Regions:
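C-terminal motif of bacterial Sec signal peptides marking the signal peptidase cleavage site
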Residues: 20-22
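Bacterial signal peptide processing site
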Residues: 24-26
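The feature marks proteins involved in alpha-glucan
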Residues: 30-32, 36-59, 103-184, 220-224, ...
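Short proline/glycine-enriched turn/loop motifs at strand-loop junctions of beta-rich domains
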Residues: 72-78, 189-194, 886-888
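C-terminal beta-strand-rich structural cap/linker in extracellular carbohydrate-active enzymes
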Residues: 189, 233-236, 921-947
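Active-site-proximal helices and loops of the catalytic beta/alpha 8
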Residues: 204-206, 210-217, 369-372, 535-540, ...
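Substrate-binding/active-site clefts of carbohydrate-active enzymes
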Residues: 307-312, 316-319, 326, 341-348, ...
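Loop/helix patches that line or flank the sugar-binding groove of alpha-linked glycan CAZymes
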Residues: 677-681, 685-880, 885-892, 899-901
Length: 947
């Protein structure tokens, strides 16, 4: 029992009018003829309210509809009161237990075992109550306070403001909109007690007479005001008076607009802007040609980071473009020349890591650090840095200091770690404002300049022949509560963020403050934002970070809205199943297993782990791409290798077949389907369409493909063989059905010096060399915060490899050329890019299976057959791809009843005429195909004239 700090007599006085009745077996709450609050006197309101609030132990009460609230079930016979702790009028009503309606149990499955209570309030009364602090008090028969809970209100806000006609989710012009009269401002803030608008000039000084009171539309919860024409292109903020659970009091908060379209430096002020205005557009913006693809499966994605792309490029025409949007306007920088070469080979999509406004890079260049800044600037900005406590050369650059450190030492990681808070680097998964380009990538971050520069980048990529994909992060915000970079949670507290169902704490499973896209207005914000990027910035598709934390329905509805302005958009993302929403516990997720058949792509960890190896103990778990069975390292037993090998090979086969759930495999004299092959406790195959599957073996997360392999490779593998294993790993992605996703630099052996999570560790660990002279392997131990536990293993493998893991410029260039040839092979035939489940099942087969007569260890033989079904390739009737991951040249012999089937095949012309001298040793005989070690060879048979 919670002991009250005020006397029991006070409680008795409060409860004198309670009419107690016996509770039956149905465990209904004690009924009352009057509420506790009806007997309160005004002068006691504040003290009593404060006392109740001080005893609150959780936030387990959920107000779902105006007439229904739920609480965790209790065996105690208690009286529950919903109290509104408004100091002016302390109000309360008794809650009567009722059955939870089936439709609400289905809508809120994580609350389905809670007890429901009837709330006797009208819709208008409920709206008024939501503007105050709410608690539920539980009293026993002796009028003792047993429990006090705060109330979660997100669901009832949706019920009141989004489920009728012409309500909040149908308001089409939230934010600032320039119109004939001036500027319309609209902010959805249904729980706010008051909202006003403050305008600022270009110097961010408050404009005289620029504070305007806003009025609330009680039907929508939208506060609005019409300002004059002087507000056009002005900066602005909202002043919001709102009860905030973080402080448990009414706060007066100055906040930017969640629907901002332009911002000041460091996003401190929103700016009014019209994205149709010519001043926001580069020349010829409206007349540009946007590349298209015939089928979704024709896409090939190349994942870039705007700073990584050019920060290390020594061939820029202007050094100021380093790490900026402007670098994509270059014509002959090393990066642009490489992109042009990839485009010629068939690359058609540039995927940009987050480019919306983020909170973790200071946009004022004078206040952030660049790797080429001097130590003098370092010590001026952050004087407590350890290097500043020593004798140092003020003119020496950060880069040159890092270069002076021993590569096997800890100094580089220590310096980078100390400076990361102040440098100009971050991946960008720290959303501040969802619908404004990030300012740190612009030469001028203030106002419309960043908008123009972003559009120039998109326009230039389109002109190079690329579609542009944007990485978006609607699953969390950088901050919430009353923190400086909180926006949404200051306007409608505890609505936009997903809360723990009992504690009310903001869930953090994504990394940060999770958003609740199951809430209608959070889903609307996501959708409205996506439409702006697609319509006004001509973004051609979107990759969704931690998409599995969002409802499937919200994703489908967002795609429908984006398709209305861009019919050939494509959505894909991370469909991982984890956290508080795992296994559809709160809603049907946009996860791998749920999105089958939707043509929203999900990253496949199945093919990835088959190739890279899995597990946390990296050296103990090899993959097919780094020596499993055929180049076993000292940690892996022979039996483990054999067992892992057969499973990994079948997982890879399903991956090559688009990860289809229903793809048939003949295995051990029986036929199984893709969904029957295990991947841990889940099926390997889950896709119902090839567009459901994104294949990859490397991306920004985790170690690069090169670094991952060095962790796992046997020590005696030669440098040349390491490069071949690397390019063969990429071949699985490029020759698979589904859509390939390629990490920038993976084609030329990119390393991050073993760093598994480089999100905020600067240019030193994230460098890319498009001149192909260096892959930046082993440039210092990775930062301790991420990899200290791996340091002993890193030192062990570096010593064991004895330099065989160090590549030359020739290795880097050779890898890049082989990659381009494999990419060109993929794009040479639609047989690699089949567009339906039916066509894959018809045309794709594997000619050797584990435990079959045709099995040869180390060989995987895939046949793409255009002699069945509709013709998709005018050039080739059949393609056979042989992946030889063994250490020896091997021959695949066809079955005896098809002895002449190899006649008419030849090595693909691109490989015949390419730079890989090893693959050219592949041979075709009447009875089969001979392929060198560590080689992916493609054999083609020309299409018959009558086909």
């Amino acid at each position: 029992m919670i002991k009250p700090s005020i006397s029991l007599l006070t409680y008795a006085a409060l409860s004198a009018s309670l009419s107690l009745t016996a509770c039956g077996d149905n465990d209904k709450a004690i009924e009352t003829s009057q509420s506790v609050a009806e007997q309160l006197t005004a002068d006691k309101n504040s003290a009593i309210a404060a006392n109740f609030v001080s005893q609150a132990s959780d936030s387990a009460a959920h107000w779902l509809t105006p007439q229904l609230l739920v609480l965790p079930k209790s065996n105690d016979k208690l009286l529950y009161q919903l109290l509104n702790t408004n100091k002016a009028a302390f109000n309360g009503i008794t809650l009567l237990a009722v059955d939870l309606p089936k439709e609400l149990a289905a809508k809120f499955p994580h609350l389905s075992d809670f007890q429901a209570y009837k709330v006797e309030l009208s819709a208008n009364e409920a709206k008024a109550w939501l503007k105050q602090q709410l608690i539920v008090v539980a009293l026993d028969k002796a009028q003792q306070v047993k429990k006090v809970s705060f109330v979660q209100t997100g669901a009832v806000i949706d019920a009141l403001y989004t489920q009728g006609e012409k309500d909040a989710d149908e308001v089409a012009d939230l934010g600032a909109t320039i119109n004939e009269q001036g500027v319309s401002f609209k902010l959805w803030a249904p729980t706010a007690q008051n909202v006003s608008l403050q305008l600022f000039d270009e110097n961010l000084q408050a404009i005289a007479d620029g504070k305007l009171a806003m009025l609330e539309d009680s039907h929508t919860g939208v506060w609005h005001v019409q300002a004059g024409k002087q507000a056009s292109y002005a900066y602005y903020k909202y002043q919001v008076d709102v009860y905030h659970p973080a402080s448990k009091q009414v706060e007066t908060l100055m906040v930017t607009d969640p629907y901002s379209l332009s911002l000041s430096v460091n996003s401190e002020y929103s700016q009014v802007v019209n994205l149709d205005d010519e001043i926001t557009k580069p020349d010829r913006w409206d007349n540009q040609q946007i590349p298209t693809v015939k089928n979704v499966e024709d896409n090939v994605f190349y994942e870039t980071h705007i700073r990584d792309f050019s920060a290390n490029d020594k061939a820029l025409s202007n050094a100021k473009f380093k790490g900026k949007y402007k670098a994509f306007s270059e014509e002959s920088s090393d990066g642009i020349k490489h992109l042009k070469a990839l485009q010629s080979a068939g690359l058609n999509n540039i995927h940009l890591l987050p480019t919306f406004d983020i909170a973790t890079v200071n946009e004022d260049a004078a206040k952030h650090l660049d790797i080429d800044d001097s130590l003098g600037k370092v010590c001026a900005i952050t004087p407590k840095t350890s290097i500043c406590q020593q004798t140092y050369n003020e003119k020496q650059t950060i880069r040159s200091l890092l270069q002076s450190y021993a590569v096997d030492g800890e100094q580089a990681q220590q310096l980078v770690s100390e400076l990361r808070e102040y440098d100009n680097y971050n991946w960008g998964y720290d959303p501040f404002h969802y619908t404004v380009p990030e300012g740190s990538y612009a030469l001028e971050a203030k106002g419309v300049s960043r908008l123009v520069e972003f559009r120039e980048m998109v326009q230039n990529l389109h002109a190079l022949g690329f579609r542009v994909i944007m990485d978006v992060v609607y699953n969390h915000t950088h901050q919430a509560g009353l923190e400086p970079n909180s926006v949404l949670d200051k306007i409608v507290p505890n609505y936009y963020q997903r809360l723990h169902p009992l504690t009310g704490d903001i869930e953090q499973s994504t990394c940060c403050d999770n958003t609740a896209t199951e809430r209608v207005m959070m889903a609307k914000l996501m959708t409205d934002s996506l439409v702006v990027w697609a319509r006004d910035y001509k973004i051609d598709g979107f990759r969704f970070d931690l998409m599995g934390h969002q409802p499937k329905d919200a994703m489908l509805q967002s795609r429908e809205a984006v398709r209305a302005v861009d019919s050939d958009t494509y959505f894909y993302g991370e469909g991982w199943n984890f956290g508080e929403v795992a296994s559809n516990s709160q809603f049907v997720q946009a996860s791998q297993l749920e999105l089958g058949g939707s043509e929203i792509g999900t990253f496949s960890d199945r093919l990835r782990d088959a190739v890279r190896g899995g597990g946390n103990n990296t050296r103990d778990s090899q993959g097919l791409g780094n020596g499993l069975l055929h180049f076993a390292n000292e940690k892996v037993s022979e039996q483990q290798s054999i067992d892992d090998y057969h499973l990994r090979m079948n997982q890879l086969r399903i991956g090559l077949a688009g990860n289809l759930a229903n793809f048939p495999l003949s295995y051990d004299d029986k036929q199984v389907l893709g969904k029957d092959i295990p991947y841990g406790d889940q099926p390997t195959g889950y896709a119902l369409d090839p567009a459901d599957t994104i294949n990859y073996v490397s991306k920004h997360d985790n170690q690069t493909l090169w670094d991952n392999s060095q962790y796992r490779l046997a020590f005696d593998v030669s440098t040349d063989d390491r490069v071949r294993m690397h390019t063969q790993s990429l071949s699985y992605t490029l020759f698979a059905q589904g859509i390939p996703f390629l990490h920038m630099g993976s084609e030329f052996l990119r390393s991050k010096s073993f760093l598994r999570d480089s999100y905020d560790y600067g240019d030193w660990y994230n460098r890319v060399d498009f001149s192909k002279q260096h892959n930046y392997y082993n440039v210092g131990l990775p930062p301790a915060a991420k990899d200290k536990e791996n340091w002993p293993l890193i030192k062990e493998v570096l010593a064991g490899h004895e330099g065989r893991d160090q590549v030359s410029a020739k290795h880097i260039q050779r890898s890049s050329e082989i990659f381009k040839e494999m990419l060109a092979i993929r794009m040479s035939s639609a047989l690699f890019r089949l567009s339906s489940e039916k066509s894959i099942i018809e045309k794709v087969s594997f000619l050797n299976m584990a435990n079959s007569a045709q099995q040869a260890s180390g060989l995987l033989v895939m046949k793409l057959d255009d002699t069945v079904g509709d013709v998709v390739d005018e050039n080739y009737q059949t393609i056979i791809v042989i992946f030889n991951s063994s250490a020896e040249t091997q021959t695949f012999k066809l079955a005896s009843d098809s002895a002449n089937d190899a006649l008419g095949y030849q090595l693909h012309p691109i490989q015949q005429n390419g730079t890989d001298e090893v693959v050219k040793q592949s041979k075709v005989t009447a009875k089969g195909f001979t392929v060198p070690a560590l080689t992916s060879a493609v054999f083609v048979k020309k299409q018959l004239a009558n086909r």
